[in-house]
Amino acid sequence: MAQSTNKSSMVAKLLAVLGPGLFLIGYNIGTGSVTTMASAGSRWGMSLTWTVVLSCLFTYIGLFAFSRYTLVTGDTILYAIKQRFPMGRPIAFFIMSAVIFAEFFSLTGLMAISVDLLHEWIKYASGYYHAGIKLALTISLSAMLYILLWSGEYRLLEKILAALVMIMGISFLLTALLVVPSWREIFAGLIPGVPHEQGAALLVAGMAGTTFSSAILYCRSITLKAKGWRLAEQKKSLIDTVVSVGMMFLLSIAIMICAAGTLYTMNKPVENAIDMVRTLEPLAGQFAISLFIIGIVGAGVSSLIPTILIAPWVISDYTHTEINPHSKQSRIFVSLGVVVCLIGPYLRTNPVILMILTMALLAVILPLSTIAITILLNQKQLGEHKNGTGMNIACMGAILFSLIMSYYGVMGLQAYFN
């Protein structure tokens, strides 16, 4: 009995330490990650490994920086920008608006891929096809999201979805071990370079945007403040960040390896959502389609919930008010988010391309956030907690990386729409 109590206590302590990080993993490891990493691996093997490594490295630096400011001052970042920058109010308002727009745009891709895969699964399992099924799936998923978010009772569903995503994540890790390419290929992919092919710049920006995004950084600050963490919890925050980013890296690189070891060797790049099923075939065989679709739809829905909630969260950051899921403002944005979800599957764009476009857009707006946090961490009122030389070098690296990814994103989006 005592042993059981000790185990429960250990689990409780682990969850307490990883609280904010679990949100980040749930938000980050979803449809966007699977789509971009699988697309990259299927087209160019392991040659874009450097993008995953640098994205995760600078995600860690960004999370550390945003966490540090909130732990020291107790302020969230948008509010700090509004209060402490010259022209801070319009700058913070622009960042808030850009994050909301980018996240709402990403809802279209998340819902489009989820509906597309469920539709294909029903056709595969039953042999029956009807255009009305897609509409029924779209309305059903949107209605479920609306009811859950309106009531605020979605914790149980989140746990179920997290379990499904975990199964998919473990499946990718195990498959990666079966099809892992040579170390020579992996190390060659650590040398930065972008393939001279159409869509390469857009995909590189999308890979960065799905990992190192402004939304994750601001949500990190908001969740720390909501938990009441201050400098006394700095060690817990650091452990939480390391574990979260470590899991992001492992799962992202595993997905790329799976695609490189299956689709790339067959010369079958991901063109449609259903193509990604093949990445799990070495492990699951004929069950790959069911395993993949259950996992990625779980990942999609688990990403839809925090993506819709980001709008009221960043508004509460900007206005320096408590997060209230039952407020009129929150419910307006929940309603808008669900309407966007309804539209997603019917946009005249391939769901895979749509998902990559939305991830690239997140990379485009990143530089403002990295520049802002670097300035905030160098202000006099932080005293001994100001950035030292090492942290400033790290922040400058994050700024440079975000500018390069933003450039790739702009060029990629421009090329696509032209």
Go through each PLM region and give its residues.
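Hydrophobic alpha-helical segments and their helix-loop junctions in multi-pass secondary transporters
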Residues: 166-193, 201-205, 210-221, 370-382, ...
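Membrane-interface loop-to-helix entry segments
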Residues: 140, 144, 148-179, 359-366, ...
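Extracellular loop-to-transmembrane helix junctions
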Residues: 12, 39-64, 81, 87-91
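Extracellular/periplasmic helix-exit of transmembrane alpha-helices
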Residues: 61-72, 224, 246-275
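Hydrophobic transmembrane alpha-helices that form the core helical bundles
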Residues: 90-126, 300-319, 351-353, 403
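Transmembrane-helix boundary/entry motifs in multi-pass membrane transporters
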Residues: 7-11, 45, 72-101, 124, ...
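Transmembrane alpha-helical segments of multi-pass small-molecule transport proteins
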Residues: 96, 122-150, 167-173, 324-343, ...
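Flexible loop linkers connecting adjacent transmembrane helices
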Residues: 2-4, 36-39, 65-88, 122, ...
